[in-house]
A protein has these predicted regions:
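Short amphipathic alpha-helical elements of helix-turn-helix/winged-helix folds
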Residues: 25-29, 100, 104, 170
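Amphipathic, non-transmembrane alpha-helical scaffold segments
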Residues: 15, 23, 65, 69, ...
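Basic, helix-initiating cap at the start of DNA-binding domains
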Residues: 1-33, 38-49, 63-66
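Short secondary-structure transition hinges
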Residues: 100-142, 150
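All-alpha amphipathic helical-bundle segments outside canonical DNA-binding/catalytic cores
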Residues: 91-92, 128-134, 150-166, 185-189, ...
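Hydrophobic alpha-helical connector segments
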Residues: 67, 71, 81-107, 160-167
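C-terminal peripheral helix-coil segments that are non-catalytic and often amphipathic
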Residues: 1-7, 103, 139, 143-151, ...
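Short hydrophobic/aromatic patch on the recognition helix
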Residues: 47-58
Length: 204
């Protein structure tokens, strides 16, 4: 008796591929109809899957939104890291930090206005991806300040943790989609002014 082994090819798409397909379709659907107004049933009909099949991969609509949010935040983080790597000094890094967040945030979160629902929900409800993103920005600020103090670009009298917390508070309107929404038209100019303000306060 010959046993037939089922290969990945005969089983069809992998779970990972199907998850990616659901996320891609969801992002397109949310961009047209909004995250808040869309139900899992709506999404299932648009993809051609059953509602139960989608629940096999995601426990809720929020889980799908979290993946989309995490992908967007990863894009911003990658752009930010690339910009910082090209900046020769801590002073330039501060400028790039503010400017890159303003530009990337506007492009990714508001290129499709209805995707703002996801960004807003992630910030308002403290989704894990949003919390992790905030933590990473705080670490970036701290690293820049350390480098600036070591190079004697920045003052060293104020405790480092206090300075980092203050800089992040100034940065937050550009990093938080709920706040960024109110200044889309002036975000780049605002970023330059805020960076200049921070640099004046950091001067030795």
């Amino acid at each position: 008796m010959t046993e037939k082994k089922t290969t990945a090819a005969t089983r069809g798409p992998s779970d990972h591929t199907i998850r990616d397909q659901i996320v891609a379709a969801a992002m397109e659907y949310f961009s047209h109809y909004g995250f808040e107004k869309t139900t899992v049933s709506d999404l299932a009909r648009s993809i051609g899957f059953s509602k139960a099949y989608i629940y096999k991969f995601f426990g809720s609509k929020q889980e799908i939104g979290e993946v989309i949010c995490a992908n967007c935040l990863m894009d911003i983080t990658e752009r930010l890291n690339a910009a910082l790597e090209q900046s020769p000094s801590a002073t330039e890094k501060i400028k790039q930090l503010f400017q890159t967040l303003a530009v990337a945030g506007c492009e990714l979160f508001f290129r499709e206005r209805r995707l703002y629902d996801i960004a807003a929900a992630s910030s308002r409800e403290h989704w894990p991806a949003a919390v992790q993103y905030e933590d990473s920005l705080r670490e970036i600020v701290l690293a820049i300040l350390r480098a600036g103090r070591t190079a004697e670009e920045f003052e060293r009298k104020t405790p480092l943790d206090e300075t980092a917390a203050a800089v992040y508070l100034v940065l937050r309107p550009l990093a938080d989609p709920l706040q960024l929404q109110s200044s889309l038209d002036t975000a780049r100019e605002d970023a330059s002014q805020l960076a200049a303000l921070v640099l004046r306060s950091l001067a030795p």
